[in-house]
Amino acid sequence: MQEFNFNNMKREIMFVLAMLITANIVSAQRVDDKPYATGADISWLQWQEDSGIRFSDGGVEGDAIDILRDNGFNYIRLRLFVNPKSELGYSQRDGYCDLEHTLAMAKRIKEAGMLFLLDFHYSDNWADPGKQIMPQAWQTLSYEEVCQEVYNHTKATLEALVAQGTAPDMVQVGNEISNGMLWPYGSVRHSFSGLCGLLKEGVRAVREVTPNAEIMLHVALGGQAEESERFFDAMAEYGVEYDLIGQSYYPEWHGTLEELEANLRAMAKRYKKPLIVVEYRDHFLAIDSIVRSLPRGLGRGTFIWEATSPQWGKLFDEKGAATAALDDYNR
């Protein structure tokens, strides 16, 4: 167990208070009328439920989605894999995070009156800065054919969601694509050209099928200013269309809270796009205050990753009971 450090605790409290004061000043200056997202990724929820976990708040059992809504959340994020049952897949037996499971979850989200962010991974398994593995069914295709598959997969998914009345309000074209996606074609090691061609096909499908959905480009560079600038300058150079910037922020990989704030402020000034910290695990109050304080109201929200996981989001314990951490959102 680590020794309690009063000075560190005091420093974080003072940081949060300062950011809250600034946020109140800026909040009336929003550049659009879109709702501020207090969001949760709950992509693990169906597996938990099928494993017998029942969720509760204050001893009262209920749907985890409803519990989150009743405690201040208004947005739910779901990841989508191309074929999680493939030999390379995330869920070879049950197919969690496939289209069928996503359709079922989307109904629950909309029935709860919440907004919906769909996260396309364009892989059969986890896509992140360290791996962006081509779906098994696409691995023998040419670059041009993979571009077409990105369009087809995005279009078919969104058409299925629209058909059941659960169109997403926001769409991520790729997950943590700091180093590209759909390697090797979309790697940015030597050039952004391949990635940008792939992104344009995903964006085209989103615009055609769900024109009211906002499009996010998501990188994992929370406190890394130089790398963030390199990425989004390339998006401008190659003419990739998007509406929002998404950042992941985990301190062990992405720097201090001060570095996160400095980077988000620099990005707001340089790109004039709304920004969301679309993945984080800890420090909600500080992160939320930073985002709310961004100039011109360009801070558009936060999403805690795996909110229902006792190991990650920690808003519920191993038995599914809401923890005290949930109180921070209900204010």
Predicted features, each with a name:
Residues 28-73:
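N-terminal carbohydrate-binding accessory modules
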Residues 38-40, 76-78, 116-120, 169-173, ...:
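Hydrophobic faces of well-ordered beta-strands that scaffold small-molecule active sites
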Residues 42-45, 81-83, 121-125, 173-178, ...:
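Active-site beta-loop-alpha junctions enriched in small/polar residues
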Residues 1-30:
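Bacterial Sec-dependent N-terminal signal peptides
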Residues 69, 110, 162, 236-238, ...:
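Non-catalytic positions within long, well-ordered alpha-helices that form the structural scaffold/packing
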Residues 252, 273-331:
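Substrate-binding cleft of secreted/luminal carbohydrate-active enzymes
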Residues 92, 97-101, 127-235, 240-242, ...:
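Active-site cleft segment of glycoside hydrolase catalytic domains centered on the general acid/base Glu
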Residues 60-127, 189-216, 262-264, 268-270:
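Aromatic-lined substrate-binding rim segments of carbohydrate-active enzymes
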